């Protein structure tokens, strides 16, 4: 018991230290990486396995910590990191060839009757939530929205922090009935997938999204006034648009590709986001080449903007993701998350109190680790046995936990989606968290109330 409390205390102290130094202006990537390596080394000193189960030890706790950094560079640098770099490169290329300006010019005309940028913000948020049905990865969706919707939102008068928050938050509430989290939750609840996803989770999700959209309207309006946030609305009369009108389609090619190459629209053809973005860049280059009357030299010079955008993404976003991953592994390997689980088991509370405890612990773990999946997968294992002991409906415990893990990720300064969108928007992750905090907290309250009203407590 004493060792368990020590492990939890170490996790809390290091987490608070990370927050302190980042607030003081230290570079987040360096702080997170240092804290993660420290936690991994302390894990070895306490006698635990430093590396996750699928990795073999190097034989030394110090080199094990370095081995995990290498693993994250390969895994996130070459996986999710490559996706981010491709999308950032694509976005930079679209800006360079003038396609984003064409989009703003074209879309501003029909939307000019909407005078409030905050109504546009709500509309963008609802569109982004629908996009989560097609793109299951929170970070992938956030980066995709930053590459496509973000330039248009800021040009139409939505402040940069508010626009980043919109891109970071659509995956906070799960809508997709085929999401891996939903499938596991349905299994643990003992309900058929269609009953759990459509009849149980979906009504709660819709209520939460409506509340979060309204909260985003008022909260961002309040913060913009309070912080005197500069608006970047473009004066259309002064906007220089040299590219032809059909360039307006180009920035949306990745989004179009997600729907076209999903294996159903064109049966037999399924492409992942990496290939879709590469194809989008290729189409953009081809269109630009034809538009410039087959001036190959100029077209290839313009393409350099794509490579520069990818390089900037590695420095500003991907290394942050790597560092955040090392930090999250440090927290998990030292036992901080397992000890939170133990607290839930020994709490011995009533139905509603137990649901609140499990939900609170899931949110706390999601904020600390930056992961929406890991806390839920860990805590959901407890729900069926706890529900059986107390005669509760497992779904009553699981639905708030399911949504809480994703909501918690959206207010974590070390989560992939917050780090990635903040990096692309060139603002602090803490600014994103500030913008998403009130909508997320109200969304969580809505989920809890919705569960209590719509889901039977007892089996």
From Swiss-Prot:
User: GO CC annotations?
Assistant: plasma membrane
Q: What is its main location?
A: membrane
Q: Which residues form the signal peptide?
A: none
Q: Which InterPro entries match?
A: C4_dicarb_anaerob_car, C4_dicarb_anaerob_car-like
- UniProt keywords, alphabetically: Antiport, Cell inner membrane, Cell membrane, Membrane, Transmembrane, Transmembrane helix, Transport
Name any one GO molecular function.
antiporter activity
Q: Where in the cell is it found?
A: Cell inner membrane
Q: Does the keyword Cell inner membrane apply?
A: yes
Annotated GO biological process: C4-dicarboxylate transport
> Per the record's keyword annotation, is Protein biosynthesis included, yes or no?
no
> Pfam families, alphabetically?
DcuC
- The transmembrane segments are 3-23, 28-48, 79-99, 118-138, 139-159, 164-184, 195-215, 243-263, 267-287, 317-337, 347-367, 437-457
Q: Which reaction does it catalyse?
A: fumarate(in) + succinate(out) = fumarate(out) + succinate(in)
According to its record, how does it sit in the membrane? Multi-pass membrane protein
Which family does the similarity line name? Answer: Belongs to the DcuC/DcuD transporter (TC 2.A.61) family.
Concerning NCBIfam families, the annotation shows: DcuC, DcuC_1, PRK10654.1
Q: What does this protein do?
A: Responsible for the transport of C4-dicarboxylates during anaerobic growth. Catalyzes the uptake of fumarate coupled to the export of succinate.
Report what the protein is called.
Probable anaerobic C4-dicarboxylate transporter DcuC
Native source species: Vibrio cholerae serotype O1 (strain ATCC 39315 / El Tor Inaba N16961)
The gene designation is dcuC
